[in-house]
Amino acid sequence: MSDKIRTLQGRVTSNKMDKSITVAIERQVKHPIYGKYIKRTTKIHAHDETNQCNEGDLVAIRECRPLSKTKSWTLVEVVSKA
């Protein structure tokens, strides 16, 4: 197992839960036949201890131990406000 901690940047799509946010991570994938780059989105639940995020914020998150059934990421910082 590698010692490198995974960090990602994404946009907050929901902050309706207490101390939790939903972050959309966008990546580009090359189509196997046509070669065109397509946008793909992954939604991740992350822990926001102080409830400081709002919808549309650009945030940095890092992987951590499982905090619940779906949460295993935590908020590092708010890169830019919406």
From Swiss-Prot:
It comes from the Bacteria. One of the primary rRNA binding proteins, it binds specifically to the 5'-end of 16S ribosomal RNA. GO terms for biological process: translation. This is Small ribosomal subunit protein uS17. Part of the 30S ribosomal subunit. GO terms for cellular component: cytosolic small ribosomal subunit. The keyword Aminoacyl-tRNA synthetase does not apply. One of its GO terms (molecular function) is structural constituent of ribosome. Pfam families: Ribosomal_S17. The gene is rpsQ. It comes from Shewanella baltica (strain OS155 / ATCC BAA-1091). The keyword Ribonucleoprotein applies.
